[in-house]
Amino acid sequence: MASNHGFDLTDPDDLSDKYTDAELKSMTEEEKSDALNEKWYNYCVSESFEPGSTFKPIVVASALEMGAITTDATYVCDGGEFVTDTEIKCDNIYGHGDETLSDVIKNSCNDAMMQIGMKMQITPFLKYQRLFNFGSRTGIDLPNESTGVLYDRDSMHEVELATNTFGQTFTSTKCRLPLHYMRHLMQW
């Protein structure tokens, strides 16, 4: 996971590849700490991003778990939803048509995901985001881990719920997302 090509995993505290001995001796502790943090920087740990469609199976699992949907439910994708007064389009603006739950995942259908989110409602949706540890650190032994940014109950409304269901308008790290799938795949 080293994203710094000059990084030597066997000597992570060595700054001699970037600074002379004289420069190192003249550095304050804060300057050395800043230089090490820059060297140890890893975008998979420190940068957050919108997980997008990779989040959809987590929403479906949560909705099934709480009983908001069933495996035999069907959905109609007509290319988008009007949420309050906001039109939010599916990636397929012409619509996927009638879909089973399996089709929703296979087609990566934003329209159906919004319908699922509305059945979950805001408070339970946020609860499941937290149960899956979004908004928290993984505990990886690397510095500067980001938590990502989530809505809370006061700031999430129907439009934010709708866009969150297909992995937009909140953030996570590239280290956080695989953990949700690994624990289930390891059981197979």
Language-model segment annotations:
Residues M1-S53, I58-W188:
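Beta-lactam-recognizing serine transpeptidase/beta-lactamase-like catalytic domain environment
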